[in-house]
Amino acid sequence: MDIYLDVFNNEIVGYDVRDSMHGNGIINHREALNDMLNNKIKRGYKELETIVHTDQGSVYSSVSFNNIFKSYMVTRSMSRAGTPTDNPVIESKNGWIKKEMYIDFDINNYNTVQKFIDDIVWDNNNFRPSYALNYKTPIDYKTQLGFK
């Protein structure tokens, strides 16, 4: 699963889930990245610089993946090898999603993993208050501050 998170308000702005990380090669990861970049444009932030931070996995360091950034104002950032603590926000979000699979959501009630993840993302962005956001949801927080 690929997740793109806006660390300003902890909103998941792009994601993709597949049966296998390598099942469709770079296509899996490009789709999630394109969702995030298109979301950036829809929100009116095309001209603002964006930092995309990833680990050093083979997909994220590939030429094909990095070519996507050429037409966007994106700065690449990568964790040091074997150092997940360089990206604690996304590591925490991944951990939360895995816990939610068993606690708040019954994965057995879903026909597909994609639908399950769609619901988790919707819940995160629209219904899950965060201490860091003064107990507001990601959408409420950015809206109250006047952002799209």
Predicted region positions:
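Acidic/histidine-rich, metal-coordinating catalytic segments
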Residues: 45-60, 84, 137-139
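C-terminal domain-tail junction helix/linker
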Residues: 66, 70-74, 96-148
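RNase H-like polynucleotidyl transferase catalytic core
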Residues: 52-56, 70-89, 105-110
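Active-site beta-loop-alpha junctions of metal-dependent nucleic acid enzymes
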Residues: 16-44
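Surface/interface recognition patches
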Residues: 19, 31, 44-46, 61-77
